[in-house]
Amino acid sequence: MLNKPEVPIEAIEAREILDSRGKPTVEAEVRLETGAVGMAQVPSGASTGTFEAHELRDGDPSRYGGKGVTIAVRNIHEKIAPSILDMDAFDQVSVDLKMIQRDGTPNKKELGANAILAVSLATAKAAAAELDIPLYRYLGGPLSNVLPVPMMNVLNGGAHADNNVDFQEFMIMPIGADSFREALRWGAEVFACLSSVLKERKLLSGVGDEGGYAPNLGSNQEALDLLMEAIDKAGYKAGEQIALAMDVASSEFYKDGQYIYDGSAHSPQEFIDYLDKLVSQYPIVSIEDGLAEEDWDNWKILTDQLGSRIQLVGDDLLVTNPTRLQKAIDMGVANSILIKLNQIGTLTETLETIDLATRNKYRSVISHRSGETEDTTIADLAVATRAGQIKTGSLCRSERVAKYNRLLRIEDELGDRAVYAAKIGLGPKA
């Protein structure tokens, strides 16, 4: 981050707003003594890891079915604000540490990670506004010029859709594009062709939480076949120009040591072999949460079997947590981490986790949540950290497209300095 004379935090406001699923979430505004203001909104997940930081909900069934966040908002006004008012907005680490200390719990359950994160991000945005520079430049400095390869979730299943598909996300990745703008166009064209393919087969449905189609299909393999057909129909070469990726979210169908999919139970090794078969049959370059979040020994087997060929991303397994990431590094488990700000709860801890991953040659994928807002922080974060990949949903629903549009603007701002991650080997492991 850039150095600047101290600018104290003067005021903090917070409110309960709605996310993209119509559920309450937290918005915070941080105002500095100079008048600069930063605003941030926090997302929430549908498929959540057991070890994520605590999202504080009211539990009052008379409001939003118990999902209200008025306690989190009150915590910002009554507990967080008094702790950090007059602190230097440019000292992000100290601001975040003060909130962590004020909370005093391992998973932020006292104040709520949703309360802490909203203030953490709003503080960084206020500091960037004070300097009159974009957030990505404030966080990453002058070398922040790499636009990420998008993981576009165009077919939904699992916890993200009301259908009979086991795996949660089937994604396309434009690995052969020359720029982010071109990659986005390719993805949008494939998405449009997918709509046509589904319509022809009388499978066209509404979209899931993240904007992907959610048809009832006979198997997970049928979803991959549909993507291959859509890529071909759009005029692109699968594997060369556009690759496939999956979020299996296997914790959702793991029970009593077995994986239950396609209507029957399977041992961990049978499931690993099934994933291996899919990788051999389709141009899959990335699998997220290939095994359940506490199935560490079998994760090691999965990594040994597939890790040299594709990217194996830990989401529920690692929950943006440096302690769990260090365990994975020590065990040789996975080779990439999904980064979700609200899983850990502060900007500082998020950046520390990304740094730990980078130092140990693990890739980072910056990610949204299924319950999103119009906040575009993750787009700036992807560029600031040179992560090389971003996962922010499909090519429809404005809370998803907002992140893509922000990346288009960043690419335009950078001009000739902009580099598409796939061109310099920062895309998915292949």
UniProtKB/Swiss-Prot annotation:
It is found in: Cytoplasm; Secreted; Cell surface. Belongs to the enolase family. It holds the Pfam family Enolase_C. GO terms for cellular component: cell surface; extracellular region; phosphopyruvate hydratase complex. It comes from the Bacteria. Its cofactor is Mg(2+). It comes from Gloeothece citriformis (strain PCC 7424) (Cyanothece sp. (strain PCC 7424)). GO terms for biological process: glycolytic process. Catalyzes the reversible conversion of 2-phosphoglycerate (2-PG) into phosphoenolpyruvate (PEP). It is essential for the degradation of carbohydrates via glycolysis. NCBIfam families: eno (TIGR01060). Pathway: Carbohydrate degradation; glycolysis; pyruvate from D-glyceraldehyde 3-phosphate: step 4/5. Mg(2+) binds at residues 247, 288, 315. (2R)-2-phosphoglycerate binds at residues 168, 340, 369-370, 391. This is Enolase. It catalyses: (2R)-2-phosphoglycerate = phosphoenolpyruvate + H2O. It is an enzyme of class 4 (lyase). Its EC number is 4.2.1.11. The keyword Transferase does not apply. PANTHER family: ENOLASE (PTHR11902:SF1). Binds a second Mg(2+) ion via substrate during catalysis. The keyword Magnesium applies. One of its GO terms (molecular function) is magnesium ion binding. The active site is at residues 210, 340. Keywords: Cytoplasm, Glycolysis, Lyase, Magnesium, Metal-binding, Secreted.
